């Protein structure tokens, strides 16, 4: 019998000591997988910024900022994206990763802007490009991915980035893909430039 897997995200510690949310309160996400839902507190987060290149049918190339954020209810090794994805080791551990694509013509040096990023596989820019939840059960890690790239995807919703500071990005998420959903607020630490 499958074990109940349910996740949600709450309270994160920001490097500057604040919650990063407007109107008070701690950020949290209600996560549902297979109709089973719960709420979890986030203990740590990290991020990475890069560039995504697109080439259209005529050969024209354009770029956009690609922002990855990883949030977990355990201490992440935030050295880089690979270390943030080290395998989970305990049943209570949960990791949520998202990727946002910015405006057309931006690059890895551009800051992600506040705004709406649609969960629509047909969009190229200002979109949710990836969303996944890692859980641990029966002695192994399971990754549940939302279908964000297949043109026939049933994914709906959006991530609204409401605040970007030197230390953190905050926003609201409401994304559904079949029997999976993530809804609520979030804050993710922004990686410091060397």
Model-flagged regions — what are they?
Residues 19-149:
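An ectodomain-focused feature that recognizes extracytoplasmic/extracellular
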Residues 13-15:
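C-terminal motif of bacterial Sec signal peptides marking the signal peptidase cleavage site
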Residues 112-193:
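Acidic, glycine-rich flexible loop segments
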Residues 8, 23, 34, 88-90, ...:
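A generic structural signal for short, solvent-exposed coil/turn residues
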Residues 2-8:
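Sec-dependent signal peptide recognition
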């Amino acid at each position: 019998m499958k074990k109940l897997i349910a996740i949600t995200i709450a309270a994160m510690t920001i490097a500057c000591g604040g919650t990063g949310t407007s109107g008070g309160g701690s950020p949290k996400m209600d996560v549902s997988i297979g109709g089973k839902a719960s709420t979890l507190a986030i203990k740590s987060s990290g991020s990475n910024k890069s560039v995504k290149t697109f080439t259209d049918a005529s050969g024209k190339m354009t770029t956009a900022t690609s922002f990855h954020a990883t949030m977990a209810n355990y201490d992440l090794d935030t050295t880089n994206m690979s270390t943030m994805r080290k395998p989970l080791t305990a049943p209570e551990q949960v990791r949520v990763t998202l990727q946002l694509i910015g405006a057309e013509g931006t690059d890895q040096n551009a800051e992600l802007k506040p705004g709406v990023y649609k969960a629509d596989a047909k969009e190229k820019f200002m979109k949710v490009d990836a969303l996944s939840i890692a859980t641990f059960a029966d002695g192994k890690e399971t990754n549940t991915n939302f279908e964000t790239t297949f043109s026939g995807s049933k994914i709906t919703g959006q991530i609204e980035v409401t605040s970007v500071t030197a230390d953190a990005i905050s926003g609201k998420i409401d994304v559904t893909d079949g029997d999976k959903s993530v809804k609520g607020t979030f804050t993710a630490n922004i990686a410091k430039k060397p």
